[in-house]
Swiss-Prot record:
Record carries keyword Nucleus: yes
Start-end of Basic and acidic residues biased regions: 366-376, 430-446
Species per Swiss-Prot/TrEMBL record: Homo sapiens
Main location: cytoplasm
Tissue specificity annotation: Expressed in brain, ovary, heart, lung, liver, kidney and leukocytes. Moderate expression was also detected in lung, skeletal muscle, placenta, small intestine, pancreas, spleen and testis.
InterPro entries xrefs: IQSEC_PH (IPR033742), PH-like_dom_sf (IPR011993), PH_domain (IPR001849), Sec7_C_sf (IPR023394), Sec7_dom (IPR000904), Sec7_dom_sf (IPR035999)
PH domain residues: 774-866
A single GO cellular-component term on record: synaptic vesicle
Pfam families: IQ_SEC7_PH, Sec7
Lineage: Eukaryota, Metazoa, Chordata, Craniata, Vertebrata
Feature: compositional bias, Low complexity: 471-489
Record-given protein name: IQ motif and SEC7 domain-containing protein 1
Disorder named in the UniProt entry: Intellectual developmental disorder with short stature and behavioral abnormalities: An autosomal recessive disorder with onset in infancy and characterized by intellectual disability, developmental delay, short stature, aphasia, and hypotonia. Additional features include seizures and behavioral abnormalities, such as inattention, hyperactivity and aggression.
Length: 963
C-alpha cells in the first residue's frame, strides 16, 4: 500500500543529505547504504566490466581501500543514480513501516467496550457483504494464509539445517548426554565446570569442595581441571563466552536429574547403606562453601540461587504415590551433590512407611535449617522450600529463581529491588506451620504433570492462592462439589500468613488485600473471575491483573502452575500467551510449562499429543514455531537415547513441525480428500533433513498411521461447552449487544456458561396466562443472557430456537409478586446516559429457582460492570498519564452490595466523576479507598439486602440440562 508519509519533509531532507554527501565524494556511512555500498560487503578479486562487482559500484570508495580508481567526475555523476534510487526505496519502505506502526499504536491506544467492538465487527460485516459471506471469506483467507505460512516456515527450517535452529541449550545438552551415561562421577565433575568461571577465580577451591560429594555417590575420580587463567579473563571480558558457560551449567543440572533416575533404580540399596557416612561430609560442606557460593552468586546468581536454597533447607519429601517417579521427583534427588543421599534415604524410608499424611521434619533438622538460614540467607527466595511445597516441580522452581534474578537485576539491582532487601528474610518470620494445614480433596490431573504428585499433596502455590479459586469461579460453574467455605478460607488465610517466610512485593499487596476491610469472599471470587475473563481476552493483561491481586505468584513457575492447574482458562489463549516471542517473561513461563511435562519413553507424536492436549498449538506460524521449539527441547532432554539416533538434534524439531502440518492437512475441512497428504508425500517432505540423511522409514510410517487413526486434539475447556450450546441453538444467533445487528458468534474465548434454567415469559404482568404457557429455556453466560424455546425434542438430543439475547452490562434485576405471578422476575436496562426500560419479565416455577437464578444473574452483572469500570479507569489513567497502583480497583468494592448490583446513579457517578476517579487512582491507603467507596454508595431498588448470604453458582435442575 502506498503511503503518503513517504513524501514528507523528513524523507526529503534525508534524500538531500544523501545526495550532498555523494557529491562531495565522501565515503557513505548511512545505515541505508552500508550493506550494499561498503567495500567489506564484497570479496576481493579481479573485477570484470560486465559483472555486478564492477568498479562502477565503487565510485565513492577511497582509493586506499582496494586500490580502485573511482573514475572521472562525469562517470561518478552517471553512476550515482542507482545509489540514490536504492536509498530512496529503503527510506520509503522505512517511512511506510513507521506509518503502519503509528496507525497500529493509535488504533490500539484505546480499548473499546465490548458492545462497541461488536458494533465495529458488525459494520465490517455489512461493508463486505453480510455476516455469512464475510465470515466464510475471512475464515477461508485466514486458514489459507496460516497454512501457507506454516509450509513456508517448514521449507525454511528444512533447508537451513546449517543454522542450528535449535537453541544452544539443546545442542549443549545433546553433547553432554554422553556424560550422563558414562557414570555419575563425570556428571558431577562437569556439573560445576561452568560455575568455575567466576569473578574471584576460585575454580580450584570449588573443585576441592565438590570432590567429597562426588565420592559419596561412586568411586573417587579426578575432576576436570579448571580452565586456565587466560580463559577466566576472556570469560569475564566477553559476555558471549560467559553466557554460553552459564547456559551450559544450567542444562547440566537437568542431565544430572536424568542420570539420577537410572541410578535410583539400580543403586538405591548401596546409597541407603552409604547415607550415614554421607551425613558428616555434607554437614561440613554446609559451613565451608557458603562463602564461595556467595561470591559465585554475585556473578552467576541465576545459576547458584537454587543451590543456596537447597543447602539451606534439605528437601523434605511428602508421601509419594505408588507409581513410578516422575522427572520432577528424580530432579529433586540430585539438585546438589551432598543433599542427594539424604533425599534418597528419606524417600526410601517413606516408601516403606507408606503413609498418607505429610511427612514432618524432625526438630533437629528444623533447628539446623533455622540456623543455616540465619547464617546465610539466599539473595532471592520467591517460594522457599517447605514441607508442603516439595512436590512442586523443582526444575521449574529453579527456573523461576534463575530467570527471576534477571528481572530483579533489570529493576535496579539487589538494593533497589524489594525482593533483594536485606531484611526480606528475617529469622523471626520462619515458623514451619505447613503440616498443620488440613489436607484438601485431591484435584484429578493427568499423571504426567508433576504438579500434585500424589493424591494428598498440596503445592504451596495452590495452598497460598486457592482460597479465591474453585470450580464455580473457574469455568462453567455447573459443578458445586469443590466450593470452599468462607470459614475455611479465613482459617487458611491466617495460616498462610505464618507459612510464608519471605516478604515480597506481591506478598505485601496480598496482606493489604486480606485485611478485614476486603475479606469479603464474594468480592474475592468476583475479582478472580474478572482476572480469568481478562486473560481470555488479553492474556498479558489478565496475568498482570491476577498477579497484582495476589491470586498468582509473580514468578514464571507460579504462572506456569496456574496455566496448567486452573480451570476457566482458554487453551487457545494459553497458546497465545506462551507463544509470545517478544516478552522474556512469556518465554520463561513456556520453559517452566514444558519442564512440568515428562515425555520419557514416548514416541514423538504421542509426546506431541500430550503437549497439545494442554496447549492449543494453532495460530500464527511464528507462535507455533516457538511452541514446537520448546516442546522439542523438552523432548530431547527426556529422551537422550532417541536423540542419539539422529545426526543432529534439530531433526526432532523439524519432525515435530512436520507432524503438526500433517495433522492440520489431514483433518482440515478445507482440504479435499483427494488432496490430503499421503504417506509417500509425508516421507518425501522429510528427505535429507537429518544432516543429509533420511529419517528411518519405519518411524515415519508409524507416526503417519497413528495420526491418521487419531487426531491431535486439545482437551476441552469452558469454550467447548459454549460451542455445544451454540450447536443446539438453531435459527438466528444472539446479537451479543444492545444494538440491533446481524448476529455474532456465541462461542468466544472469554465466554463461559454460568447456568441453565427454565422460566416462563410474562408478556403482561397484569394479565393472567395459562400455566406452562410461554416456556423459555434460559442460558446465562458470564456476559450474555440468551432466551430460547425448545424447537425439537428427540430421544437423545434437543434443539432450541433463538428468541432474544441481552447484554448483562447495565442490566438490573427486580423482583415482583402479584396474584397471577408469585415468583416474578423483571429485567431492566440501566445503562448510564440511557433511559430505563423493561427488557423482559419472567415467572419462576418456584421460589428456590428464582433465588438461585437471580443470585447468579446479579453476580454475573456485577462482574461485567466491574470489568467495564476497570477498563474505563485504565483508559482514563492512560490518557492522563496516571500510573494506576496495584490496588486502585479496591476503591470500587464498597460501592457494591453483597449481591453485587450497582444502581444507575452509582454507575453515573463512578464513570462521570473525574476527580473522584483520580483520587481513587492515587489513593495510597486502604482507609482512603474505603471512605471513597462509602461516599459513592447509593441504594438500589433492585438489589438484595446486604445481609442476604451469597449462594455459589449451582446448576438448576430442569428436565433438560446441557452437559
Amino acid at each position: 500500500m502506498w503511503c503518503l508519509h513517504c513524501n514528507s519533509e523528513r524523507t526529503q531532507s534525508l534524500l538531500e543529505l544523501e545526495l550532498d554527501s555523494g557529491v562531495e565524494g565522501e565515503a557513505p556511512s548511512s545505515e541505508t547504504g552500508t550493506s550494499l555500498d561498503s567495500p567489506s560487503a564484497y570479496p576481493q578479486g579481479p573485477l570484470v566490466p560486465g559483472s555486478s562487482l564492477s568498479p562502477d559500484h565503487y565510485e565513492h570508495t577511497s582509493v586506499g581501500a582496494y586500490g580502485l580508481y573511482s573514475g572521472p567526475p562525469g562517470q561518478q555523476q552517471r553512476t550515482r543514480r542507482p545509489k540514490l534510487q536504492h536509498s530512496t526505496s529503503i527510506l520509503r519502505k522505512q517511512a511506510e513501516e513507521e506509518a503502519i506502526k503509528r496507525s497500529r499504536s493509535l488504533s490500539e491506544s484505546y480499548e473499546l467496550s465490548s458492545d462497541l467492538q461488536d458494533k465495529q465487527v458488525e459494520m465490517l460485516e455489512r461493508k463486505y457483504g453480510g455476516r455469512l459471506v464475510t465470515r466464510h471469506a475471512a475464515r477461508t483467507i485466514q486458514t489459507a494464509f496460516r497454512q501457507y505460512q506454516m509450509n513456508k516456515n517448514f521449507e525454511r527450517l528444512r533447508s537451513s539445517m546449517s543454522e542450528n535452529r535449535m537453541s544452544r541449550r539443546i545442542v549443549l545438552s545433546n553433547m553432554r548426554m554422553q556424560f550422563s551415561f558414562e557414570g555419575p562421577e563425570k556428571v558431577h565433575s562437569s556439573y560445576f565446570e561452568g560455575k568455575q568461571v567466576s569473578v574471584t577465580n576460585d575454580g580450584s577451591q570449588l573443585g576441592a569442595l565438590v570432590s567429597p560429594e562426588c565420592g559419596d555417590l561412586s568411586e573417587p575420580t579426578t575432576l576436570k581441571s579448571p580452565a586456565p587463567s587466560s580463559d577466566f579473563a576472556d570469560a569475564i571480558t566477553e559476555l558471549e563466552d560467559a553466557f554460553s558457560r552459564q547456559v551450559k551449567s544450567l542444562a547440566e543440572s537437568i542431565d544430572d536429574a536424568l542420570n539420577c533416575r537410572s541410578l535410583h533404580t539400580e543403586e538405591a540399596p548401596a546409597l541407603d547403606a552409604a547415607r550415614a557416612r554421607d551425613t558428616e561430609p555434607q554437614t561440613a560442606l554446609h559451613g565451608m562453601d557458603h562463602r564461595k557460593l556467595d561470591e559465585m552468586t554475585a556473578s552467576y546468581s541465576d545459576v547458584t540461587l537454587y543451590i543456596d536454597e537447597e543447602e539451606l533447607s534439605p528437601p523434605l519429601p511428602l508421601s509419594q504415590a505408588g507409581d513410578r517417579p516422575s522427572s520432577t521427583e528424580s530432579d529433586l534427588r540430585l539438585r546438589a551433590g551432598g543433599a542427594a543421599p539424604d533425599y534418597w534415604a528419606l524417600a526410601h524410608k517413606e516408601d516403606k512407611a507408606d503413609t498418607d499424611t505429610s511427612c514432618r521434619s524432625t526438630p533437629s533438622l528444623e533447628r539446623q535449617e533455622q540456623r543455616l538460614r540465619v547464617e546465610h540467607l539466599p539473595l532471592l527466595t520467591i517460594e522457599p522450600p517447605s514441607d508442603s511445597s516439595v512436590d512442586l516441580s523443582d526444575r521449574s522452581e529453579r527456573g523461576s529463581l534463575k530467570r527471576q534474578s534477571a528481572y530483579e537485576r533489570s529493576l535496579g539491582g539487589q538494593q533497589g529491588s524489594p525482593k533483594h532487601g536485606p531484611h526480606s528474610g528475617a529469622p523471626k518470620s520462619l515458623p514451619r506451620e505447613e503440616p498443620e494445614l488440613r489436607p484438601r480433596p485431591p484435584r484429578p490431573l493427568d499423571s504426567h504433570l508433576a504438579i500434585n504428585g500424589s493424591a494428598n499433596r498440596q503445592s504451596k502455590s495452590e495452598s497460598d492462592y486457592s482460597d479465591g479459586d474453585n470450580d464455580s469461579i473457574n469455568s462453567t460453574s455447573n459443578s458445586n462439589d469443590t466450593i470452599n467455605c468462607s470459614s475455611e478460607s479465613s482459617s487458611r488465610d491466617s495460616l498462610r500468613e505464618q507459612t510464608l517466610s519471605k516478604q515480597t512485593y506481591h506478598k505485601e499487596a496480598r496482606n493489604s488485600w486480606d485485611s478485614p476491610a476486603f475479606s469479603n469472599d464474594v468480592i474475592r471470587k468476583r475479582h478472580y473471575r474478572i482476572g480469568l475473563n481478562l486473560f481470555n481476552k488479553k492474556p498479558e493483561k489478565g496475568v498482570q491483573y491476577l498477579i497484582e491481586r495476589g491470586f498468582v505468584p509473580d514468578t514464571p513457575v507460579g504462572v506456569a502452575h496456574f496455566l496448567l492447574q486452573r480451570k476457566g482458562l482458554s487453551r487457545q489463549m494459553i497458546g497465545e500467551f506462551l507463544g509470545n516471542r517478544q516478552k522474556q517473561f512469556n518465554r520463561d513461563v513456556l520453559d517452566c510449562v514444558v519442564d512440568e511435562m515428562d515425555f520419557s519413553t514416548m514416541e514423538l507424536d504421542e509426546a506431541l499429543r500430550k503437549f497439545q492436549a494442554h496447549i492449543r498449538v494453532q495460530g500464527e506460524a511464528q507462535k507455533v514455531e516457538r511452541l514446537i521449539e520448546a516442546f522439542s527441547q523438552r523432548y530431547c532432554i527426556c529422551n537422550p537415547g532417541v536423540v542419539r539416533q539422529f545426526r543432529n538434534p534439530d531433526t526432532i524439531f523439524i519432525l515435530a513441525f512436520a507432524i503438526i502440518l500433517l495433522n492440520t492437512d489431514m483433518y482440515s475441512p478445507n482440504v479435499k480428500p483427494e488432496r490430503k497428504m499421503k504417506l509417500e508425500d509425508f516421507i518425501k517432505n522429510l528427505r535429507g533433513v537429518d544432516d543429509g540423511e533420511d529419517i528411518p522409514r519405519e518411524m515415519l510410517m508409524g507416526i503417519y498411521e497413528r495420526i491418521r487413526k487419531r487426531e491431535l486434539k486439545t482437551n476441552e475447556d469452558h469454550v467447548s461447552q459454549v460451542q455445544k450450546v451454540e450447536k443446539l441453538i438453531v435459527g438466528k444467533k444472539p446479537i451479543g449487544s444492545l444494538h440491533p445487528g446481524l448476529g455474532c458468534v456465541l462461542s468466544l474465548p472469554h465466554r463461559r456458561l454460568v447456568c441453565y434454567c427454565r422460566l416462563f415469559e410474562v408478556p403482561d404482568p397484569n394479565k393472567p396466562q395459562k400455566l406452562g404457557l410461554h416456556q423459555r429455556e434460559i442460558f446465562l453466560f458470564n456476559d450474555l443472557l440468551v432466551v430460547t424455546k425448545i424447537f425439537q425434542k428427540k430421544k437423545n438430543s434437543v434443539t432450541y430456537s433463538f428468541r432474544q439475547s441481552f447484554s448483562l452490562y447495565g442490566m438490573q434485576v427486580l423482583l415482583f409478586e402479584n396474584q397471577y405471578y408469585p415468583n416474578g422476575i423483571r429485567l431492566t436496562s440501566s445503562v448510564p446516559g440511557a433511559d430505563i426500560k423493561v427488557l423482559i419479565n419472567f415467572n419462576a416455577p418456584n421460589p428456590q429457582d428464582r433465588k438461585k437464578f437471580t443470585d447468579d444473574l446479579r453476580e454475573s452483572i456485577a462482574e461485567v460492570q466491574e470489568m467495564e469500570k476497570h477498563r474505563i479507569e485504565s483508559e482514563l489513567e492512560k490518557q492522563k498519564g496516571v500510573v494506576r497502583p496495584s490496588m486502585s480497583q479496591c476503591s470500587s468494592l464498597k460501592k457494591e452490595s453483597g449481591n453485587g448490583t450497582l444502581s444507575r446513579a452509582c454507575l453515573d457517578d463512578s464513570y462521570a466523576s473525574g476527580e473522584g476517579l483520580k483520587r481513587s487512582a492515587l489513593s495510597s491507603s486502604l482507609r482512603d479507598l474505603s471512605e471513597a467507596g462509602k461516599r459513592g454508595r447509593r441504594s438500589s431498588a433492585g438489589s438484595l439486602e446486604s445481609n442476604v448470604e451469597f449462594q455459589p453458582f449451582e446448576p438448576l435442575q430442569p428436565s433438560v440440562l446441557c452437559s
